Amino acid sequence: MKKRIILGMTGATGAIYGKRILEVLKAQGGFETHLVVSDAGALNIHYELGIKRGALGELADQVHRIDDIAAPIASGGFKTEGMIIAPCSMKTLAAIAHGFGDNLISRAADVVLKERRRLVVVPREAPLNLAHVRNMVSLTEMGGIIYPP
């Protein structure tokens, strides 16, 4: 059975990170990837990589709509190895740190944390203000991993 990994891509710059993660997981084999791209993430994918969301989705095994809160990845019963959010906007990081599951990325991240699975976020912001740092601390205390690029 393949290991399931969720990849969220948000509106922060650095779409290449998410694309490369999908490429590497596909090349390695043994992984079932579930991709969720926010609307702002889709814009950045287009601006930074010159491709549409659908073209990126071809690298994933499953693509879920950002507004599909009923998707399987929004349930703790859907077993995964964890989730990576790359790039992760400060908005998404704040939503996760405060339990605000208003879309499928933040909801899936909430589920990953409550099920004690790995959540890795790749924040793309500099410099950081105090709210950013506090949200990163909160997410780390909840079991998340902050992985700056």
Tell me what each language-model feature is.
Residues 1-120, 126-149:
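A cross-family phosphate/adenosyl-ligand binding-site feature
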